[in-house]
Swiss-Prot record:
Oligomeric form and interacting partners: Interacts with uS11. Not a structural component of 40S pre-ribosomes, but transiently interacts with them by binding to uS11.
Pfam family, one: AAA_18
Gene Ontology molecular function terms on file: adenylate kinase activity; ATP binding; ATP hydrolysis activity
Catalytic activity entry: AMP + ATP = 2 ADP; ATP + H2O = ADP + phosphate + H(+)
Keyword match ATP-binding: yes
Renumbered residue ranges of the record's region LID: 103-113
Protein source organism: Methanocaldococcus jannaschii (strain ATCC 43067 / DSM 2661 / JAL-1 / JCM 10045 / NBRC 100440) (Methanococcus jannaschii)
Function: Broad-specificity nucleoside monophosphate (NMP) kinase that catalyzes the reversible transfer of the terminal phosphate group between nucleoside triphosphates and monophosphates. Also has ATPase activity. Involved in the late maturation steps of the 30S ribosomal particles, specifically 16S rRNA maturation. While NMP activity is not required for ribosome maturation, ATPase activity is. Associates transiently with small ribosomal subunit protein uS11. ATP hydrolysis breaks the interaction with uS11.
Keywords assigned by UniProt, alphabetized: ATP-binding, Kinase, Nucleotide-binding, Ribosome biogenesis, rRNA processing, Transferase
Region (NMP) residue spans: 30-53
Annotated protein name in UniProt: Putative adenylate kinase
Catalytic EC class: transferase
Annotated ATP binding sites: G10, G12, K13, T14, T15, R104
Length: 177
């Protein structure tokens, strides 16, 4: 079983995935790290300081791991595009995402792009199949993990519970060159 933990950068995917790994003993594949380490990309986008993923190579890489593991967690903001059986979409207040990404040293253009993606529900809208959406804003990690475990156990589906558009609409009209 492939479980995708997806969401805009800065929502808490890696933190949540690590706790799930520790509590459930499930193999976690950090998509970003795997793409870099195993050169599963076609090029590096210097402007956005990111890699253009070769999805064919990445899919093959995941398939090989999945042959050995009964269940895997795919941790990454594109994990919902990798044929998961179940998708957890983590959401977070755009202001918190902004702070986290700036702390990580993201360029202003990349910060804005990610804030806009969160406001517009990009990861949620791209997610097809069984989807469970969770707002992580100001929540305890253990509480979030408990909710995820319960959702997976009962194959719960929930989406459309978070809407940042009205409160953060002004971010959608900004542009950084």
């Amino acid at each position: 079983m492939r479980i995708a933990i997806t969401g805009t950068p800065g929502v808490g995917k890696t933190t949540i995935s690590k706790v799930l790994r520790d509590r459930l003993g499930i193999k976690v594949i950090d998509i970003t790290e795997a793409v870099k380490k195993y050169k599963l990309y076609t090029e590096k986008d210097e402007d956005m300081d990111s890699y253009v993923i070769d999805f064919e190579k990445l899919e093959k890489f995941i398939d090989e791991i999945e042959e050995k593991e009964k269940t895997i967690i795919l941790d990454g903001h594109v994990s919902h595009l990798l044929n998961p059986d179940y998708i957890i979409v983590l959401r977070c207040n755009p202001e918190i995402i902004k702070e986290r990404l700036e702390k990580r040293g993201y360029k202003p253009k990349k910060v804005l792009e990610n804030i806009q993606a969160e406001i517009l529900d990009v990861c949620l809208c791209e997610s097809k199949g069984k989807v469970y959406e969770i707002d992580t804003t100001n929540r305890d990690v253990e509480n979030i993990v408990d909710e995820i475990i319960e959702a997976i156990k009962h194959k719960k589906e929930r989406k459309g519970v978070v809407d940042w558009t009205e409160k953060y609409f002004d971010y959608l009209t900004l542009e950084i060159k």
